[in-house]
Regions:
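Selective transmembrane-helix segments that form parts of the transport pathway or gating/packing helices
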Residues: 46, 50, 54, 94, ...
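Membrane-interfacial helix-loop-helix connectors in multipass membrane proteins
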Residues: 67-91, 158-201, 205, 209-228, ...
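Short, membrane-interfacial amphipathic segments enriched in basic
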Residues: 3-36
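A hydrophobic alpha-helix feature that marks transmembrane segments and, especially
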Residues: 101-119
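Final/C-terminal transmembrane alpha-helix of multipass membrane proteins
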Residues: 225, 231-247
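Short cytoplasmic-facing helical segments at TM-TM junctions of multi-pass membrane proteins
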Residues: 115-139, 222-225
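Membrane-interface alpha-helices at helix entry/exit sites of multi-pass transporters
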Residues: 41, 129-152, 227
């Protein structure tokens, strides 16, 4: 029996994940079914995440500026190089990755808990018994919201990160805002923004698809929902980091 083979549980779980994605892809054309839920998810995934993204961006940029200045405390480099390093690091890597890891906890936990609770309380079964396509109604809008909102949140994190760097540099007397921006512009390339957008789209899909899968197939009552939520968050973070490495190896 395949179920008795080593690693069979992982193979079966991947099969369920692939099946859910296939059903979601097929159901994505049923816009009238998930239209209302989609706009609600835009608000929950996007608008309600702005405060935490603001804090993450500001302090990431500020700390990175202070640490970069500490490492480059020498006359061998112009002070503008600090702005270059901070801006490049934020745009290419930190704005997308750190935001994704934070959102895996905030957004991912919410989605997996919602779907898991609906599964164990038989609300999903009730939807299907009434003729609703549960995947189209519940899963598709959440994945689409991730795909569309994560790039916007990435830009938000990048902007606030650079502003945080400028502020920290000026307040701490490291370098004036004009010199920071001069350095940032000197090594700015449009391809960096494109790379960041690609990352954010991939991360949005990875996180929302994994947490939807874990929540949708949750079982075992309240304890099972908690387990599914924990697994969803951990797996999302792991696959965000793996996909980050893969994208860097392929695109850079």
């Amino acid at each position: 029996m395949i179920s008795n083979l080593p690693g069979s549980a992982g193979i079966q779980e991947f099969g369920h994940y692939a099946k859910l994605l296939y059903q979601a892809l097929r159901s994505s054309t049923e816009f009238s079914t998930y239209r209302k839920n989609l706009f609600q998810e835009f608000i929950k995934v996007g608008y309600e995440s702005i405060p935490i993204i603001f804090l993450v961006g500001i302090f990431t940029g500020a700390v990175l500026t202070l640490q970069t200045a500490y490492q480059l405390d020498t006359d061998l480099y112009p002070s503008t190089i600090i702005g270059s390093i901070v801006a490049q690091s934020i745009i290419i890597e930190l704005a997308a990755v750190i935001s994704a890891l934070v959102l895996a906890g905030k957004v991912g936990a919410r989605i997996s808990t919602e779907l898991g609770t609906m599964r164990v309380s038989e609300q999903i079964d009730a939807l299907e018994s009434m003729g609703f396509n549960s995947v189209s109604f519940l899963v598709v809008p959440r994945i689409l919201a991730g795909l569309l909102m994560f790039p916007i949140l990435y830009v938000t994190a990048a902007v606030f990160g650079i502003l945080g760097g400028i502020t920290a540099g000026a307040v701490d007397g490291i370098l004036p805002a004009a010199e920071f921006l001069e350095g940032a512009r000197a090594f700015f390339f449009e391809s960096d923004i494109i790379f960041g957008f690609i990352k954010s789209i991939v991360f949005g899909f990875v996180i929302t698809s994994i947490v939807c899968f874990k929540g949708y197939y949750a079982f075992g009552g309240a304890e099972g929902v908690g387990t599914a939520t924990t697994q969803a968050t951990v797996l999302s973070c792991i696959f965000v980091l793996l996909s980050d490495f893969a994208l860097a190896a392929i695109l850079l």
